[in-house]
């Protein structure tokens, strides 16, 4: 510990606190450091070590492990999970072997599927699996620079914020752009008028998706024009774009039906092929006709189509994932000493309601909230009680059955979640 020199109180060379304000002051050859600054340095070094460890560890995950981890959270999208697992593995190889970065191009992904099928969840799950920063943006809010709306650089700012402004970590993050189909140009032919929220946004996204040194305003670009910009290399960022692309099945059907014209052509009813079968025939030209410019599609080499969820898939989503909705509510009831039981028929009824509303998996929570709202309001008074949800309760908006907990022998069958 440092001592007073010439009866003058010594101070830390870093925080300038004198020795009376700190517990210990350590002397060096030409200065002093206090115990608080030492603790701060240790914390910063540990955080940096964890960050570097996380970045290096994820590269060792093989595609099969990534695939299994996705399927633990996302139900009914095995093919899309396999495609994404390979794409992320290629990205990991590029991180581990930087000399291959110029030789092996990154695999930006385009996810196509109806609302509520799990596009956003897959992207979020991927970021958690490989432990990298994740940011999400809505394409409908983006405009070209200089117009009212959000600049594309703000997407990178969100990723930087998710990485706690650690530029090195942010440069290896994942950006998910939702509703990408909403920035399709209005017609297949180039327009002579300015399309600042459609084709203009696609043009603005080209550079950052391909890889460039982006100048990111840390406080947002338009309200603080005098601020200093942060330089971020987007070369190693993985971009995942998702959209429902409503109506693209008609474009695919029109193309495929033209190739089977003639006396020997098989006449098919519109009901012969479902949505999932039609999407399996998707080609890049179909997306161009929908309104995505060829240059933009060129930055999205990997295209994965997600299946429309059927009744059984929705029932599985309710019970099978690690964070399944039924498990979440059962845990909440358990914390208050109550037991929540869903009969099998009740789960089917919930899935049928979601299908009728065409909200996919996204609508399941809203239905459960509606069924359990009054019961949750009185949950603190339901200790040692059993709450049973039947199909009739779900279909007719009735109150759940509440009764004292029964012995295992006489208890109704509980859904294994």
Swiss-Prot record:
Keyword Secreted among record annotations: no
Q: Where are the transmembrane segments?
A: none
What job does this protein perform?
ATP-dependent specificity component of the Clp protease. It directs the protease to specific substrates. Can perform chaperone functions in the absence of ClpP.
Identify this protein by name: ATP-dependent Clp protease ATP-binding subunit ClpX
Positions binding ATP in this chain are: 114-121
Question: Gene3D superfamilies annotated for this entry?
Answer: 1.10.8.60, ClpX chaperone, C4-type zinc finger domain, P-loop containing nucleotide triphosphate hydrolases
Q: Name one GO biological process term.
A: proteolysis involved in protein catabolic process
Record's keyword annotation contains Kinase: no
Q: Where does Zn(2+) bind?
A: 12, 15, 34, 37
Question: Where in the numbering of this chain does the ClpX-type ZB domain appear?
Answer: 1-53
Q: How does it assemble?
A: Component of the ClpX-ClpP complex. Forms a hexameric ring that, in the presence of ATP, binds to fourteen ClpP subunits assembled into a disk-like structure with a central cavity, resembling the structure of eukaryotic proteasomes.
Task: Name any one Pfam family assigned in the record.
Answer: ClpB_D2-small
Taxonomic lineage:
Bacteria, Pseudomonadati, Pseudomonadota, Alphaproteobacteria, Rickettsiales
Going by the UniProt record, its keywords in alphabetical order are: ATP-binding, Chaperone, Metal-binding, Nucleotide-binding, Zinc
Task: Kindly state one GO CC term assigned in the UniProt record.
Answer: HslUV protease complex
Molecular functions (GO terms): ATP binding; ATP hydrolysis activity; ATP-dependent protein folding chaperone; protein dimerization activity; unfolded protein binding; zinc ion binding
């Amino acid at each position: 510990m440092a001592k007073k020199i010439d009866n003058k109180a010594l101070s830390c060379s870093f925080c300038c606190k004198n020795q009376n304000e700190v517990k210990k002051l350590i002397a060096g050859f030409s200065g002093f450091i206090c115990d608080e600054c030492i603790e701060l340095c240790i914390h910063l070094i540990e955080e940096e070590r964890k960050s570097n460890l996380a970045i290096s560890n994820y590269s060792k995950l093989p595609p099969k492990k990534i695939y299994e981890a996705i399927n633990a959270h996302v139900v009914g999208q095995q093919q899309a999970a396999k495609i994404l697992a390979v794409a992320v593995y290629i990205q990991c190889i590029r991180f581990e072997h930087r000399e291959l970065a110029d030789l092996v191009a990154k695999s930006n992904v385009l996810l196509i599927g109806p609302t509520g099928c799990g596009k956003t969840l897959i992207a979020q799950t991927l970021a958690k699996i490989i432990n990298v920063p994740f940011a999400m943006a809505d394409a409908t809010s983006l405009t070209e620079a200089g117009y009212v709306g959000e600049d594309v650089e703000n997407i990178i700012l969100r990723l930087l914020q998710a990485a706690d402004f650690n530029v090195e970590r942010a440069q290896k993050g994942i950006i998910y752009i939702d509703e990408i189909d909403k920035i399709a140009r209005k017609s297949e032919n180039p327009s002579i008028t300015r399309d600042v929220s459609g084709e203009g946004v696609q043009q603005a996204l080209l550079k950052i998706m391909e890889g460039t040194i982006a100048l990111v305003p840390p406080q947002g670009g338009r309200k603080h024009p005098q601020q200093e910009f942060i330089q971020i290399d987007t070369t190693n960022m993985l971009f995942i774009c998702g959209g429902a692309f409503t109506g693209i099945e008609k474009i695919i059907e029109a193309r495929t039906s033209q190739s089977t014209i003639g006396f020997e052509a098989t006449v098919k009813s519109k009901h012969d092929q479902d949505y999932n079968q039609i999407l399996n025939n998707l080609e890049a030209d179909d997306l161009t006709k929908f309104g995505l410019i060829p240059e933009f599609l060129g930055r999205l080499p990997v295209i994965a189509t997600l299946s429309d969820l059927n009744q059984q898939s929705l029932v599985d989503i309710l019970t099978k994932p690690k964070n399944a909705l039924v498990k979440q509510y059962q845990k909440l009831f358990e914390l208050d000493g109550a037991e929540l039981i869903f009969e099998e028929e009740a789960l089917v009824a919930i899935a049928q309601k979601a299908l009728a509303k065409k909200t996919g998996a996204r609508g399941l929570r809203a239905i459960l909230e509606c069924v359990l709202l009054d019961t949750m309001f009185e949950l603190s008074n339901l200790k040692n009680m059993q709450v049973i949800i039947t199909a009739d309760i779900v279909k007719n908006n009735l109150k759940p059955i509440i009764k004292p907990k029964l012995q295992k022998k006489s208890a109704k069958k509980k859904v294994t979640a």
